[in-house]
């Protein structure tokens, strides 16, 4: 006669869910986390940042005046976001002051909730005041706050602002979205300094 452990049967769906979540997390980090090697060297980040910046200027010429009037700009050429219930995003970029590269930063975020899929996008953050720039540089794990305006640029549409109409000290543009994942957001994203 076969003895059946009812506790094991009862916990089977929970264990299956935990296993799927665990595998999703591991898969996400294996696919999206970038290792510190030649492909992520400072020179490669700088090159990619310049290409992304020129792309933004082409699709929205109003951003040229914003760039020229900003004391500093953080350019993250590619952010990869993926999720299956648990999700996360990661990207690396360069901080430019007076158009010269001075530091490298990562963006990382985690999320939980209904989500499935993957997406890549670019992000440029314009620091419009010296005070906003200093707050960013002194805090490791900096997050966008109430002093920031975030614009998600859809294909074919201008972001609708110029350096004369910006009212916040931090201005972020998310653009060039590729892939399918609802809810692209910078909420909860942490920016940390990298050594490159």
Language model feature labels by segment:
Residues 3-22:
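Bacterial N-terminal signal peptides that target proteins for export
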Residues 29-32:
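C-terminal motif of bacterial Sec signal peptides marking the signal peptidase cleavage site
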Residues 34-196:
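Small-residue-enriched, tightly packed secondary-structure blocks
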């Amino acid at each position: 006669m076969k003895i059946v452990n009812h506790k094991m049967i009862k916990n089977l769906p929970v264990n299956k869910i935990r296993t799927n979540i665990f595998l999703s997390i591991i898969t996400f980090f294996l696919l999206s986390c970038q290792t510190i090697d030649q492909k992520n060297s400072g020179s490669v980040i700088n090159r990619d940042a310049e290409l992304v910046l020129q792309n933004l200027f082409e699709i929205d010429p109003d951003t040229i005046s914003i760039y020229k009037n900003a004391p500093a700009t953080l350019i993250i050429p590619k952010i990869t976001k993926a999720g299956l219930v648990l999700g996360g995003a990661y990207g690396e970029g360069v901080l430019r002051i007076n158009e010269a590269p001075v530091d490298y930063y990562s963006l990382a975020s985690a999320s939980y909730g209904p989500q499935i899929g993957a997406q890549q996008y670019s992000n440029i953050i314009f620091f419009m005041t010296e005070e906003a720039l200093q707050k960013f540089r002194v805090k490791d794990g900096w997050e966008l706050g109430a002093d920031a305006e975030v614009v998600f640029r859809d294909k074919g549409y201008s972001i609708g602002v110029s350096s004369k109409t910006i009212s916040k000290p931090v201005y972020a543009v998310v653009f060039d979205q590729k892939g399918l994942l609802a809810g692209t957001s910078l909420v909860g994203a942490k920016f940390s300094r990298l050594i490159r």
